[in-house]
Amino acid sequence: MKKWFPALLFSLCVSGESSAWNNIVFYSLGDVNSYQGGNVVITQRPQFITSWRPGIATVTWNQCNGPEFADGFWAYYREYIAWVVFPKKVMTQNGYPLFIEVHNKGSWSEENTGDNDSYFFLKGYKWDERAFDAGNLCQKPGEITRLTEKFDDIIFKVALPADLPLGDYSVKIPYTSGMQRHFASYLGARFKIPYNVAKTLPRENEMLFLFKNIGGCRPSAQSLEIKHGDLSINSANNHYAAQTLSVSCDVPANIRFMLLRNTTPTYSHGKKFSVGLGHGWDSIVSVNGVDTGETTMRWYKAGTQNLTIGSRLYGESSKIQPGVLSGSATLLMILP
């Protein structure tokens, strides 16, 4: 005879500190530094140094799903990552771009190098450090703490634009510098603030870069208007018109002149540079007789040279129409 015993199934759900959790807090420093670059000319790359200095930091971002406070009676794990997010380009007070390059990053790891706007330097430490320390594990934005860590300086170079006017410059460069603290309930937890989030963190640090430009190059005009005049639709094709501007340089220099189109052409012209004029017409644009849209000029000493921009009309009979033609391009002056 078989005896049946009732089976009991127990279901247990445990919550609290035994559940997996992660708390991430970012503390922003707010240093204001200045660096004197001295007298420079456009062909030089003046340098400046950013230093990580311990000090008071403010919480500017957090993401927490764990306990706010540790009482010292249970263990948790922590990892820290120092961040510096620095712009690749800034503008002078008179509207000229300065392009920032990395000269020496010390022991920092440079990441996300393909970003168009910012440099990302990271320094991680205290990986999987087990701790019992009592304290706040999820400080809120606006709360403060003191950071005592010290890290290597980062040295940058500045590429000056070829047509930067002479004079004194005081350029403010805002950037992010701070500490990511990550607390977790389990060994091996890893978290890094996403780069797109790091770019939006407040840039509460400021580098004031001071220098004096004592040698540059200047075009005689900031814009040129090339007029073809009133033409018959039957005789406009292949019509040529040009304008010349002079470029003066105070110092020896190699300048690359390159065109960028602002209006899309109607036709494909192979390697020739062209802009669209509307009504089925294009302009094939040349620089000093070269129709690829770029040329290089050399100044072996201070002086003035001429640059001729030419426009040759092109249209196919099946597409051209009468009307007012208009198009544009931007001429860049680029140092090597």
Curated annotation (Swiss-Prot):
Among Gene3D superfamilies, the record links this protein to: Bacterial adhesin receptor binding domain, Fimbrial-type adhesion domain
Q: Which residues bind D-galactose?
A: 79, 124-127
**Keywords of the record:** Disulfide bond, Fimbrium, Secreted, Signal
Q: Which family does it belong to?
A: Belongs to the adhesin PapG family.
Q: What is this protein called?
A: Fimbrial adhesin PapGII
Q: Matching CDD domains, A to Z? A: PapG_CBD
> What is the purpose of this protein?
Tip adhesin component of type P pili that plays a critical role in kidney infection through targeted interaction with the globoseries glycolipids containing the Gal-alpha(1-4)-Gal disaccharide present on uroepithelial cells. In turn, transcriptionally regulates host gene expression in kidney cells, leading to inflammatory pathway activation and renal tissue damage. Acts thereby as key determinant of invasive uropathogenic E.coli (UPEC), which cause pyelonephritis and urinary-source bacteremia.
Q: Where in the cell is it found?
A: Secreted; Fimbrium
Which GO-annotated molecular functions does the record name? carbohydrate binding
Determine the domain of life of the protein's source: Bacteria
Q: What else is known?
A: Strains of E.coli that cause infection of the human urinary tract produce pap-pili (P pili) which are hair-like appendages consisting of about 1000 helically arranged subunits of the protein PapA. These pili mediate binding to digalactoside-containing glycolipids present on the epithelial cells which line the urinary tract.
Q: Name the principal localization, coarsely classed.
A: secreted
**Cellular component terms per the entry's GO annotation:** extracellular region; pilus
Q: Where is the signal peptide?
A: 1-20
| Gene Ontology biological process terms from the UniProt entry | cell adhesion
